[in-house]
Amino acid sequence: MQYRSLTFEEIEILESNSCWAEDWSRVEVAEDGFQAKFFHRVMFYGDIQLGSFQKEVEITKGFVKHSGINDATLRNVTVGNDCLIEKVGNYINNYTIGDDCLISNISVMETTEGATYGEGNLISVLNEVGDGNVIFFHDLNSQFAAFMVKHFNDKDLKNAIRRLVKEEIARTNPERGTIGNNVKIVNTREITNTVIQDDCEISGASRLSDCTILSSEYASVYIGTGVICENSIISDGSSIVNSVKMQDCFVGEACQISNGFTASQSVFFANSFMSNGEACAAFCGPFCASHHKSSLLIGGMFSFYNAGSGTNFSNHAYKMGPMHWGILERGTKTASGSYLLMPATIGTFSVCFGKLMHHPNTTALPFSYLIAEADKMYLVPGRNITTVGLYRDIRKWPKRDMRPQQTQKSIVNFDWLSPYSVGEILQGKKILENLRQASGDNVSSYNYHEYVINATSLRKGIKYYDIALRIYMGAVLKRAHKWGFFGKPQTEIGLGRWNDLSGLLLPVSEERRLIEDVKSGSLETIEEVVNRFREINENYRIYQWAWTYRMILEYYGINEITPEDDARIKRDYIEARRAWIAEIKKDAEKEYEMGDVDREVFESFVNSLDHEVDFEN
């Protein structure tokens, strides 16, 4: 924008409207469109730049005021075109304000020396008293954060990532606080050292200090009444409302945090929903949900997670400090009143009931129920595979992704059966078969570590795991035909173990390659690292086929997939899928018989199950 000095006539108008300047020569205005008559009772200090003031601004639906500045003190401020700024109780200091903004009834807004806007903040998740394992920056996604948490004990990698982040921040951080275009800030007390991007609305917040709000035209951010937010970054499409208190947190895209939720040293990504409760040193990956006042998420890594009321974790043995932590793998739930003593690792898509005290590690028995009754711990392997809850979950998550295409930083792979989870299922099936072989069939229960597995549960577990394996192989084979890569895989990438980096499913070999490329300097910028995550995700189906092809050969004891084998796998797939749907229908009928499920709801669900045959071919 081109600026000019004020004319003598404009200064006269301003002064007649009770405006005052420390030095009128340091007040510059837009060459076109500046109108002094829309300024009343304004005090100018330092260097001031003012845009044009020609349009009206909508205050609320059906109520407009002309743009201008009234009842405000400004020091070293640039104001864009057609803003309305009024009722500033204290002052605005060292800020750049964009076009078409409404700022009304605020106390103070300023940038102080050394402001970082929440960028570069190093926090410790999982281990509450650790050295720090997540660095905040505006392009952080769930993969990058999980990668840091997992590997920051590698000092060379940690130093390399810190250097990349430092360079990115130095390149992008503004010299002073900025307010984007179309921003609305009303009835707010204090905004300090905060960058607020386009189309954000802040209404009634108490304090925003050292924050970056990554709002955008396609996914605006809303900050509501009573919110206190310090040393944090809030991403596109999120809302923080109703007296949330947050320190040292990163909030990813389309998250909702509300109703007095308190959080410190935690990260939340991609459509997570947090209300009423508390989080401390928690890593909440995509689609985490906690609704209840009495739930505490502490020292844990979660994704696709649902916390029942009264869920609690203990990261403290009252000896060496609150340093213990655990991982609840993708899709895990904790029932009402559940408690987990860290350290612990819970396998994918499991459900925890009661007070689990013996540091369980069930990664090799996924989709299980873990049940504590008095001093006994029961494990029901594979039970969750055939529940209504799992069926609803795996279908609802893709529909509930509220992130516009333009703002999807975190990668979310929705496959519930993947080389990662199926690898665990293969281990689980083998463990159950070995237990059965070791103790025989004529026993009432089996022991697995501290857990008791009833004989009927073990037999059903083997059956359910096998159903899942056949569904997986058939589905991948069908996709290989459809996408044209059926036959011997063209790559060995994908063989071996797989991991879940908070939504990104990838071969361990690719994760190791990424570590080496960051350490060696082959990846020279944050953008290149983020692009590598995207590249791995784009090749997911190819890597998956390499892994699944080998699995099919081993499962069926064949050397290649002949047309006869292909037909057999398809038959097994259809048979397994129908058995799976039949078990889910039984689970739904059992719940309906409890008497409080509306018949229409039950029939609608059963009808959706009946349509599953449409997806067999």
Language model features with spans:
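N-terminal charge/polar-biased segments
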Residues: 1-3, 616-617
